[in-house]
């Protein structure tokens, strides 16, 4: 068997990416081999500077070029409304609907005992501090439909109430298929879910 060490190593690294199997990783590795040196250098430079150039917004924890992201620094956004999402791709999906003009808070995960993700592993403490230090009128929870999402939403609701938050706490409706998630939902369905959001009791 003709094993090429460098190619095998590259294939192994690529196959660690989500959704990439060994065969696809091999095809991508061969594609990169066929690329010219200029492209490979540019590709390498971007990868090596990824953590240096991309930051977490100090307010909402979105990915950003700067310490404060474009949304949080935009005076035209409704800063009295916070949409809580699990991840950056979920935030992008909601932005794409053009039906929400508030700001965001990215948790970085959902409570999941089976996966070993507890309350302290996601940014609930930071959310409460943010709400307590600002004049917030509405918290909109926008999670995909799952048991972990329900658990996390319920905990956030209880914690906000325990901290005397008197504004609205809403949650998007499930126009989204249970087999889907926010990141992959079509914009029309997601927009309707936002417009039809309901108050949590």
Swiss-Prot record:
InterPro entries noted in UniProt: DNA_Rcmb_RecR, Rcmb_RecR, Rcmb_RecR_Znf, TOPRIM_dom, TOPRIM_RecR
Keyword presence, Zinc: yes
Superkingdom of origin organism: Bacteria
Disulfide bonds: none
Gene3D superfamilies xrefs: 3.40.1360.10, RecR Domain 1 (1.10.8.420)
SMART domains (alphabetical): TOPRIM
Annotated GO MF terms: DNA binding; zinc ion binding
Zinc finger boundaries on the chain: C4-type: 57-72
Stretches assigned to the Toprim domain: 80-177
BP GO terms, sorted: DNA recombination; DNA repair
Keywords for this protein: DNA damage, DNA recombination, DNA repair, Metal-binding, Zinc, Zinc-finger
PANTHER family: RECOMBINATION PROTEIN RECR (PTHR30446:SF0)
Function: May play a role in DNA repair. It seems to be involved in an RecBC-independent recombinational process of DNA repair. It may act with RecF and RecO.
NCBIfam families listed in its UniProt record: recR
Family, similarity comment: Belongs to the RecR family.
HAMAP family: RecR
The name this protein goes by in its record: Recombination protein RecR
Organism of origin: Brachyspira hyodysenteriae (strain ATCC 49526 / WA1)
């Amino acid at each position: 068997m003709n094993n090429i060490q460098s190619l095998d190593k590259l294939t192994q690294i690529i196959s660690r990416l989500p959704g990439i199997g060994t065969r696809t990783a091999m095809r991508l590795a061969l594609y990169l081999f066929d690329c010219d040196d200029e492209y490979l250098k540019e590709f390498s430079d971007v990868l090596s500077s990824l953590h240096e150039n991309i930051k977490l917004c100090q307010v909402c924890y979105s990915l950003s070029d700067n310490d404060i992201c474009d949304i949080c620094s935009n005076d035209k956004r409704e800063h009295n409304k916070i949409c809580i999402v699990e991840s950056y791709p979920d935030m992008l999906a909601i932005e794409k609907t053009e039906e929400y003009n508030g700001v965001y808070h990215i948790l970085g995960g959902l409570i999941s005992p089976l996966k070993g993700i507890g309350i302290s592993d996601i940014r609930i403490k930071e959310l409460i501090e943010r709400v307590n230090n600002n004049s917030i009128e509405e918290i909109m929870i926008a999670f995909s439909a799952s048991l972990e999402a329900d658990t996390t939403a319920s905990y956030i609701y209880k914690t906000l109430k325990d901290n005397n938050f008197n504004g609205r706490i809403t949650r998007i409706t499930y126009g989204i298929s249970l087999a889907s998630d926010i990141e992959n939902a079509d914009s029309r369905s997601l927009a309707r879910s936002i417009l039809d959001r309901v108050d949590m009791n």
